[in-house]
């Protein structure tokens, strides 16, 4: 399909089958090596700055020491927040902990909750990667008892914290929150109830994470290409001209 053409979807694909979720240390080690390159070359971020990093480091330390269970709730206004947060957890939390004088006993990681539609449009590599990183799939459009039970067990007994977006999907609203689903609060309450029934002393912490994107320079070429695509699709033409090069972004979390 050539650039500027939009092909309608006329077929229905069968539901996908994912491997059982189980973290592979070799895969995680590989992702720690590749994540900085992907962030720079794939997502085009020039730098990542973390604010109040000692809070995240302290939350992970309390989880690994058995004092608390941890649920990470992150804003999802665009499409690359899960990748950005995964990079930060894999590659930066331990360094930030050392700078804050916090001793981290294990390599940080998090189990991300995702909809079944993500590996469907994400391609074969993502379908291979997500289960091996311990990601937790769930159906959004129908009742998924098996998926919810899997999440409930992970937050109560898993070896890593659980991460999800309270917005439920990409919100396309970086400056405001259009809505918040009940998932994060409900999962935290489930965990607290399970801990109480089991007589366990841990508390449940919710770590909120937000993102701010700062363009290093004006990056108008990508917007220009998207505008041309839309105009071609609806049969209009534009005489506007924009920059011809993309520029990296920086992000704060």
Show the residue positions of the predicted features.
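Soluble catalytic domains of membrane acyltransferases
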Residues: 8-14, 23, 27-253
């Amino acid at each position: 399909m050539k650039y500027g053409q939009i092909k309608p979807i006329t077929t229905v694909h069968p539901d996908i089958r994912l491997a059982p979720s189980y973290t592979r240390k070799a895969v995680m080690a590989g992702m720690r090596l590749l994540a900085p390159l992907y962030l720079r070359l794939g997502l085009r971020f020039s730098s990542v700055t973390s604010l109040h990093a000692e809070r995240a480091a302290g939350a992970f330390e309390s989880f690994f020491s058995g004092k608390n269970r941890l649920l990470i709730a992150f804003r999802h206004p665009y499409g690359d927040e899960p990748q950005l947060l995964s990079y930060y957890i894999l590659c930066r939390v331990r360094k930030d902990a050392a700078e804050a004088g916090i001793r981290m006993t294990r390599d940080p990681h998090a189990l991300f909750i995702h909809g079944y539609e993500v590996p469907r449009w994400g391609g074969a590599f993502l379908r291979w990667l997500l289960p091996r990183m311990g990601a937790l799939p769930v159906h959004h459009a129908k009742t998924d008892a098996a998926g919810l039970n899997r999440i409930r067990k992970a937050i109560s007994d898993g070896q890593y914290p659980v991460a999800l977006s309270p917005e439920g999907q990409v919100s396309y609203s970086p400056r405001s929150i259009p809505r918040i689903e009940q998932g994060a609060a409900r999962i935290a309450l489930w965990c607290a109830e399970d801990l109480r029934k089991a007589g366990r002393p841990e508390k449940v912490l919710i770590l909120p994470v937000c993102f701010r994107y700062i363009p290093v320079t004006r990056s108008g070429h990508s917007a220009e290409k998207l505008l041309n695509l839309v105009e071609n699709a609806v049969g209009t033409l534009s005489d506007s001209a924009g920059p011809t090069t993309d520029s990296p972004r920086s992000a704060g979390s």
